[in-house]
Amino acid sequence: TTLFRSWSGNCGNLSTAAGAFAIHAGLVDASRIPHNGTCVVRIWQANIQKTIIAHVPITNGQVQETGDFELDGVTFPAAEIVLEFLDPSDEGEDGGALFPTGNLVDDLEVPASVVKSGVLKATLISAGIPTMFVNAEDIGYEGTELREAINTDPQALARFEAIRVAGALRMGLIKRPEEAATRQHTPKIAFVAPAKDYRTASGKEIIAGEIDLLVRALSMGKLHHAMMGTCAVAIGTAAAIPGTLVNLAAGGGEREAVRFGHPSGTLRVGAQAEQVAGQWTVTKAVMSRSAR
């Protein structure tokens, strides 16, 4: 096993904790911290060269840690921290290059062991974190799968890695397939499907009418137990742009927010996207997390 450190991405949960920690550690000027209310902490994420704004609740001059906000996949409720990811795509002052290939949907060449035709449709997007989305149906899934269905199947994991390698090459993140082995953090790979009833890992029933679509995502070679915060940014951004696979799974059309179903429950995420001179841009993506 080769050990390596990757500086290629970000973590949404750690971004949430960073704002609260900055206040605890005295990194935020005391004059900016209300006795009761919300403290706005601007975070510079050096890995991705982006600004993240954390809205941290304050009670009696201290970071509020308890509350009734429940983040599915995290044990026990806590205080709600709202995160704003400013200009979450890779480049540009007014929204950036969202789609590295210039396409809302690409035809990826993949091994026949992945799909018999050797071609798989994918949306390749850089927002929050470089992410590739494919249709669950195209790879033989429902979109309701839990971790055990995939993480205990070595062949399934190998198929997903083959898809991820193809996406990384097309996005320009790697030049040779073998480089993907030392770039496990990015791109993320997720599969989407229209909303349908399912049960979460804890047995909770999610009704199709409660969500806009289903999303399952892999991180570091395994299906995630819930949803990564950075991938949620990519989901919200892609959903806001008509024609992406995420948008189509959600029913198509223009939308500023979606609630999607993941293995542990649901999550709502929003994004502000617009088309300028024929190019889609996104100025902000917003979601709530807890710092537990």
Report residues per predicted region.
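C-terminal catalytic subdomain
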Residues: T144-L146, E161-A190, K196-E205, E210-R255
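Short, small-residue-biased leader/transition segments that mark boundaries at the very start
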Residues: T2-L3
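Conserved glycine-rich phosphate/nucleotide-binding loop
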Residues: A30-E109, D197-R216, T237-R292
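A conserved active-site cap/scaffold subdomain adjacent to cofactor or substrate pockets
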Residues: V119-P177
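Internal alpha/beta core interface subdomains
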Residues: D29, E91-L98, L108-Y141
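Active-site histidine-anchored catalytic micro-motif
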Residues: G9-G19, R42, Q49-I53
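DPxDG-like acidic metal-binding loop motif
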Residues: N13-L27, C231, G236-T237
